[in-house]
Structures are given as structure tokens and as C-alpha cells.
């Protein structure tokens, strides 16, 4: 696979399932526009999007309940969505799957550090030389529960630093903890 030329210099919203995804809805209701919207996993069953990133094998949703509340919405989406849905392996039961260009992205970035779906989407943006990334719903830890945090924040922040270094503008939802965006100035 080669980079997608039409993405070069474009503004992309990447929307995950964390609480700050509501900031995406607010942005849209206030007429913010994006050249493309990329959905992470089950968010694709809720919002209009151009691409889906799901780095789990489709069998996780088709054959098990391992994804909990995401299972049913992903099951329907995978069987009907025409793509592109970037994933780690193809499955003939899902017409829209495209194998994520892992070799190409790793070779381009000279880096193997990818451990969650959002990081793969950010790395894909870097590889495609987008002009701006606006992130919503990538919240990895939560102010109301100091003892819980999802894995993957450091990896996403690492890839965002690589994007910034490459001249890509990075904007984070105001209520997200990513890059400490939601930390009050007095803290």
C-alpha cells in the first residue's frame, strides 16, 4: 500500500470512545469541519466517518463476547460496512476490511512502538502527511477515578510528538487528559 495522496495536508478528526468524544459532537454542532473523520472501533456505529481503525481481528467480535458492550454494534458494522476498516487481518465475512499497512508505516517512521488502535490511527496520519489532527475521545485516564487508567496513553503521546516534529498541527479535545490538555493551570 502507498500513502493516500488526497490526505496530504488535510485536517483529520480522530474520534475514540472516551468521554471527550462529546467535544466532537459539540464541535460539529458549532460548524467545525474536517476533511475526514476517522472512527476508532465502535464509535463507527455512532458517527459519520470516512475510515475506521479496528486493530483487533474481526473474529474477536464475530466469535466471542470479549469486547463487552462493543460486541453487538461491531458485529453489525463489520458485516455491513463497505470500508475502509483498517485491521490486523482480513476476514472474508467482513467486506470492508483492509489490512493496516504496518510494514510501510514502521519503515516510514523508523519505529515499532504501536500498542493500541488510536496510536495506529495517529501513525497512519503521520505516514499520510496530513496537515492537522484533531483528537476526541482519547482520554486514557479519568479525573473521577484516579485509580483507573487505560493502557496506551504514552504510545499515543509518543506518536503525537512525532507528528508535531513533522509539522502536523495537533489539537486535543479540551476535556481530554491526553497531553495533559484538561489539567487546570493551577495544577
State where each predicted segment sits:
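Metal-ion/cofactor- or nucleotide/acyl-coenzyme-handling active-site neighborhoods
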Residues: 1-187
